[in-house]
């Protein structure tokens, strides 16, 4: 853990447009554990593989658990869905996982201050490789109740 705090690595900007969510999240989680600070942009354009109807049904059943007064609270915004997916691939209940999670920022679209920055992509997570159906995180979020004005 001391290694992560003493190192100051530059901020890496990752463009999630057209990347498979789970594969991207696992690669980013690994890099976060090495101490890198990562910013993910275009979170709503990442893709989820599988049949849209099945994934939406599973998500709505999962969302039925809990409520407003008591947890668990479920993410509906695309940036929250992506952030939570990365969190699931970190050892979040340990100090190194919490510290790594703090080094992650996720945005819908591209913020003005990051537009001129060089953006990376994850080569192993390209959606072009998929032979099955897929849909975007933005479509998924709209189906489970995200209002784009939020």
Stretch-by-stretch model annotation:
Residues 1-150:
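Ribosome-associated RNA-binding proteins
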